[in-house]
Amino acid sequence: MKLCDFESDYEIPNNWVWCNLGLLFNHNTGKALNSANSEGKALTYITTSNVYWNRFELNDLKSMPFTDSEIEKCTIKKGDLLVCEGGDIGRAAIWNFDNEIRIQNHLHRLRAYDYIQTAFYYYVLYAFKLSGKISGNGIGLQGLSSNALHNIIVPVPPIEEQKNIVMSIEKLMLSIDNIESHKNILAICIENTKAKILELAIRGKLVPQDPNDEPASVLLERIRAEKEELIKQGKIKRDKKESVIFKGDDNSYYQDLPSNWINIRLSAISEIITKGTTPRGGKIAYRQSGIGFLRAENIAGYDKLDLSNLNYVDEESHKNYLKRSILKENDILITIAGTLGRTAIVPQHALPLNSNQAVAIVRLVNNKLINVKYLAYTLNSPIIKSDLLAKSVDMAIPNLSLDNIAECNISLPPLAEQKRIVEAIEKIFATLDDIANQVE
């Protein structure tokens, strides 16, 4: 890049000058490992894969032979600036360790001459990278050669000003890190608060009870009657296990609930609990358009679907081979492979949809007798999630069985109270989300 290009892009103070980077640093590259130069003593070295912006990853270092002359040329010392030739072109870090080490040929070593603040030029390279002056839009090379690096035009302030600039940048960086740390702490606090709200909700302690509400036991009998009719019609099979549970397996999960609540298995209120299907041919079956095909990554949590990265299958597959997993409005979806237990509710506007085998589908007997949002929030409560995770199968990809889902213990309040609980949860969650958004 020519000097005039930089002069047109940047204005510098009168007591600064422009200069080639190579005039400010002693510049070397490392050693290439090949059969022609295999003599010398085996020593550890680093490559571009060890160098990140302002940091190093030094696990599993490799060794190769270095002769005495190669050691002198390829060794880095504390304070040297390393710059990547390829990969993320121009990525740089300062070696701030007391021990010395060797470098491979795709790394540039810049050792500053007197009156040069190395950290200042690290930040210059970082600024050039962010603005496109290195790679793509600027130097425009597939690799940053020694000649290209040498010829990069950089500003040269007085040495004391270089030091002051570095101090100011690092002070700002520290402030930013502190802000990010506090944001992370706040995010954790918000998630913990949400978890506590859900815990209170499923224990009947979030909203007051109304003695005039129809008890959940009566509600359950109405659901059972509808389910029995579906069984008689041959549309569904009878549950394998009794549906009412008054205590958890450890005799403590489900105690002290309000008198008009009841404990049930999820299967007691479900018409079907199944999972999606892998299309024939796997990913080859995906289309550019057609029927939306959900994967675990589309299940965003609570009641939300993320349709931003949706795959598609053709309508014939949807109606035939994949007919078991045709989704309906208000189906509750649960991830059962990979990241376990995320939930979503299928909205009418997103249909038609299908899903793959990493997603469980829970379809209620009657959506008018159970508030699907209450059920989704219940499945996200710490008690339920920990119970499900405890039952997961520890494989290369953790997974939950449909039996795990069906046997999930649900604290069921009266229908009217379900609605009040959902309203309270969403009001509190909206406030917490507003707080989180204000610090973004």
Where are these regions (language model features)?
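Phosphate/adenylate-binding "loop-and-lid" substructures adjacent to NTP/NAD/dNTP-binding pockets
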Residues: M1-C4, P215-Q255
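Non-catalytic DNA-recognition/assembly elements of restriction-modification systems
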Residues: K2-K31, K163, H182, L186, ...
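Sequence-specific dsDNA recognition surfaces
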Residues: F6, G22-S35, S49-K78, K247-S252, ...
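Short, well-ordered beta-strand elements within core beta-sheets of diverse protein domains
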Residues: E7-E11, H108-A112, H150-V156, Y253-D256, ...
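Structural signal for hydrophobic
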Residues: W16, A92, N151-I152, Q162, ...
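A short beta-sheet element
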Residues: T47-T48, M64-Y126, G138, S145, ...
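Specificity-determining recognition surfaces
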Residues: L125-V154, K283, T378-I410
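Amphipathic alpha-helical coiled-coil/heptad-repeat segments
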Residues: S131, N151-E229, K385-K391, D403-E440
